[in-house]
Every structure is written in C-alpha cells, then in structure tokens.
Amino acid sequence: MLPEVIENKQLIGVKQMQAASHVLMVLPRASKIDALEKIPYLEILRSALKRRRMQPDELAKSPITTDLAQGGVASWLMLDDGASRFEQYSVLRKGIALLTAEQPREIVLAVFGDSKQRTLAAELAVYVALINSAVLPSRKQKTKIENVKKIVLYGDQSRHGHAVARAVAEGNTLARELTMLPPNELTPTHYRAQVKKLARANDWKNEEFDFKRLKKMGAGAFVAVARGSHEQDAAIVHLSYSPKGAKQRIALVGKGICFDTGGHNLKSAKYMQGMHEDMNGSAVALGILLAATRLKLNIGIDAWLAIAQNHIGPLAYKQNEVITALNGATIEVVHTDAEGRMVLADTLNLAARAKPDLMMDFATLTGSMAVALGSRYSGIFSNRETLLTQAIAAGTRSGERVNSFPLDADYEPALDSKIADIKQCTMDGEADHILAARFLMRFIEQRPWLHMDLSASSCEGGLGAVASNVTGFGVAWGVEMLRNLKL
C-alpha cells in the first residue's frame, strides 16, 4: 500500500523542519542563493555548497544533504522549469534516494517559488515520493525493510489530491513487484492465481484460455511454446474493464514469459540470468489497467496476457517446425529463443477479433532493441503515423521516453519462407526488432496498433522517476496515452 499524502498550502517553517526527520527541499533554479527567499536553514545550504565548491544551480542535477539542528536530514535540490520531464524526475529521484536510504517512515516535501513553480514541483515530487516508497520483493531474512507510511507536503494543495500520481505510482509498483518475483514464485500457475485476485479486487471480468482450449482453437503459435512445459499451465488471460458509457475500447496485450531458457536454442548462463523478468510486458499491461481503473477512465479496456514459459524438453518446439497460428498463417520456426513473437502472434489475433479501436502491445521482445537504444529509451512501432506522433508526445510528458522505428515493406522479404507463409525470424539477426514488429503485424487484422519493445524495462541505477533497476517502464507512458488519446 502506498503512503497517505497530507497537504499544507503554507510554506514550511523552521518549526516544521525541526520536527521532521527527513525533508526534501525543492527550490526553483537560481544561480545565486541570495535570489531565494523565505527558505528556512538557507545558511546551512550556503555553507554546504561552499564546502563542496558547488554553484547553487548545480543542485538542478546533483542534490546534496545537510544535517539539521534537531537531528533530522534535509535533501536539497533545484527544479528547472525549462528542463524536460525526464530530467526533472531524475533529479527528484536522486534527491528522494538520499532520504529513502535511511528507510524513513515519514518524508516531508517542501516546495518553493511562485505559485506556478510550487504546483509543478509538488505534482512531480509527490509522484516520485510515492513511486519510490513501496517495499519491493526481497527474501533476505536478516534485513527488514520499512516502507514510507506518510508523505507531508508543504507549499501547495492540489484540487484532486494527486489522484493521477497515486494511480500511476500504484500501477508502476504492481508491474515492478510482479517482475521482480523469483521464477519459482511466479510460474504461470502462480501468475494466473494472482491475476484472479486482482480481477476480483477491481471488478474486472476474467476469462482464461488455457492450454487445452487454445490447442482446440488452433492457436498453434502459442501452443508451440507452451507445450515445452511439463505442467502445461500456460494460458492467455483476458481481463475487461468496462465503464458505463465508454465509446472506445482499447486492447492491451502483454508478453508474459515467466521464464525463458531459450528452448532448444538454449541461452548461455550469462543471457539466461534475469529471464524471470521476461514477463514484464504483461505486468506493464496490468499496471496500466490498474491505473486506468483507479482513475475511472471512460475507456473500455481489454487486457490480454500471454502467460507461459519457454522450456527445453522432449515436447518443446524446435527449429524447422512449421506451425499453424490461430489466424491460419503457417510459420517456419527458425530460432526457439524468438518465443515472444510466437505467443504474441496468437494473443494479438485473439484480441483483434474483438475489433478494438486501438491495440497496444508490450514486450521485452528483442535484444537488438537494447543494442539500438540501450536501457534508457524503449522502441515503438505503429501502422498509423498519427499514433507514433501521440506516442512520442506521451513519452515526453510522462518522462518515459520512446523512439519510433520504421516498418517499411522492404524489410518483409527477409521473412520470406520456402515452406511456410512466413519465417519466425532470421538467423543473422539483422534489424531483428524491426522484423519482429513486421512479423507481429501479420496478426493484428489491420487494426490501429502500437508495439512497444521494452528495452528500458531494466536500467542499472534506476531511470527517470524510478530508483529501482526494474523500472516499470510503460505504465506512465500508457496512462498518458489513454488520457490524451485521439483516434
């Protein structure tokens, strides 16, 4: 559970700071300390900057801490109005991290500047404090981690109680919690049980297409991957959020590979490490659905989660097989470690049959996207130029940055097969992120579609607003897309 937020319109004073144990001081950017007014303990900050040989405006990138007279600690930073949302979130994350390292039960946020500056600073600081206050999964016996119970804000009072910040933070936290669970605690069986609990708690309609049902339906692409698991507990899970009066329906599709060995084309130990996080796309879809539900968005949402594992064994699919997908297309298997596009093919086609106004899928799909972008951006593809424009704008506003890639038809011949309708991938791997998107496009029935290849699902040291290595990237972006969607 995220902490409560208590708001005070008045600026923080010396008395409140003396009573606080952990304070985040968010100042407007200024080149000189003398330009700042009505800020308690400013002389302490001045001395700390002098000791570090820092200029005041360096606080816009590198926060510092000072001890307070009554035993508390203050983290000082400056927020630049002209910086990007990503840059603003990044400095706030660094400032909050200096406080959360001590596991405080309460954090005080103090914002300064004119009314416009304080409102922006409060909005961003509350979000960053919320998103970094939850205790994430850990199984250390001797280390008890306390989560933040209360956030107290001085300097601004919102009209809506920071509802958007709380909803997005809750959705992001859910995505990270699921992604970080060890693979013995999040098998497809466990995952499906957790999803059922979420569905009951949030009044979502829940339908499961289990292994036997999918096999009977002819979902050969999904079944090919799922059949390698002895338990045969894989499923496509369909969740529905249906507010009254909603005129649009959106499909969220997520890759949920709970562990990826690579199959017969077995990964090495180096590249198998961390493959319990290969279900991150489905967790992001769930996080967006949860946030949209909390915000009561007037959009119908169907989430389709492709939950399976990619195991090696006598029944596992192998190279050179020809598989028939749900839409009847035949697929030549080239590499068993390209399982994500296989499970997504049938899941996308199942989602497309409901004729949604927009389909958005999320997947940790290709290594080539990580090579192209690193772990600070995620890549997007679309069959509609207008959606790409909206997607990039949503990334700028949310602080979850995305970069678009081409889907030109002249990439298609690389997937030509002599024995099937399409190759799963190529052996040389050139432009695999683009070829994977071209492959998926075969299964969307020409519906408006956005595909996100989640190269930023994990970033060492955190990313933007989020301090953990697992970022939950895509939840804030997805909510921003839905809140401002134009179709």
Per-segment meaning from a language model:
Residues M1-G256:
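Short amphipathic alpha-helical segment within the helicase RecA-like ATPase core
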Residues L2, L59, R192-L487:
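A generic structural signal for tightly packed, nonpolar segments enriched in small/aliphatic residues
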